[in-house]
């Protein structure tokens, strides 16, 4: 959620109209922290008191060691050739104004150049945004270590086997921070992207990792181990009020309370 959405994007391409109902009919919306509640209130067109920092149920899995082990066992059973590899997950968001125009520029990331620059124990998982129809070109010589999982495997589950995340403006950074995963932000089109979408925070001070602007800078940072990972813990603390794995319980209690009030 670093990028602006909903009513924050009034007047922007792909943004809503002032008269659109969108999310305004919600009785309540739940968020991960008080820090971001104001942004969701603005984006959804809700009053501040309708946005509650209960924590997000889907993040409970990141505090569940048994779930993590089950996912890891299943992944390596499915892809045994990756068991002893250093796994890099490339998960960029889409460009364009929405699902109908979404794309990821083919010339932004070249698998062959990326893999040639890194050690032989490196494996790459590619997970494009569901809106993107494009698929990466994977050279034959790398198909044992480079997997396009855009059409399979849940993104959050892939984080449990990830040693390094490469992304850009995607909200996956929030979930990745819960596992203290090192991150690199490949923002080759940062200024153009900002001009079209805007952000709730200054991107360069917001992200919990090093920003790179070219594929060469990207591989150089990986080889050097230069991820600026010290930014991850304060990021996690800022954007998650609850790290106890009990957000589902809080939301369930909230729903039951609402049901009782409606009777």
Where are these regions (language model features)?
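Active-site and donor-binding regions of nucleotide-sugar-utilizing enzymes
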Residues: 1-65
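Acidic, amphipathic alpha-helical patches
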Residues: 19, 111, 155
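A short beta-strand/loop micro-motif in the catalytic core of glycosyltransferases
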Residues: 27-33, 124-125, 165-166
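Helix N-cap/beta->alpha junction signal
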Residues: 32-35, 128-130, 169, 214
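Conserved catalytic-core segment of nucleotide-activated headgroup transferases in glycan assembly
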Residues: 58-138, 212
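Donor nucleotide-activated moiety binding/catalytic core segment of transferases
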Residues: 125, 130-174
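Catalytic binding pocket for nucleotide-activated donors in carbohydrate/polymer assembly enzymes
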Residues: 139, 171-239
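C-terminal alpha-helical cap of glycosyltransferases
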Residues: 244-263
């Amino acid at each position: 959620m670093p990028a602006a959405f909903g009513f924050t994007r009034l007047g922007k391409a792909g943004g809503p109209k002032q008269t659109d109902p969108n999310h305004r009919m919600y009785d309540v919306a739940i968020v991960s922290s008080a820090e971001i509640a104001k942004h969701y209130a603005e984006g959804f067109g809700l009053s501040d008191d309708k946005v509650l920092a209960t924590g997000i149920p889907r993040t409970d899995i990141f505090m569940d060691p048994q779930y993590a082990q089950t996912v890891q066992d299943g992944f390596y059973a499915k892809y045994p050739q990756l068991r002893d590899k250093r796994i890099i997950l490339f998960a960029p968001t889409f460009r364009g104004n929405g699902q109908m125009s979404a794309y990821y520029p083919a010339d932004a990331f070249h698998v062959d150049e990326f893999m040639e620059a890194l050690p032989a124990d490196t494996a790459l998982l590619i997970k494009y945004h569901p809106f993107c129809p494009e698929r990466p070109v994977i050279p034959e010589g790398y198909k044992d270590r480079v997997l396009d999982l855009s059409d399979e495997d849940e993104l959050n589950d892939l984080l449990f086997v990830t040693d390094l995340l490469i992304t850009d403006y995607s909200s996956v950074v929030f979930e990745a921070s819960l596992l203290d995963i090192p991150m690199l932000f490949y923002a080759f089109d940062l200024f153009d992207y900002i001009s079209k979408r805007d952000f709730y925070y200054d991107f360069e001070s917001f992200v919990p990792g090093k920003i790179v602007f070219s594929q060469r800078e990207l591989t150089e940072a990986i080889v050097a181990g230069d991820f600026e990972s010290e930014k991850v813990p304060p990021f996690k603390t800022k954007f998650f009020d609850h790290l106890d794995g009990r957000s589902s319980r809080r939301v369930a209690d909230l729903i039951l309370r609402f049901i009782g009030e409606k009777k």
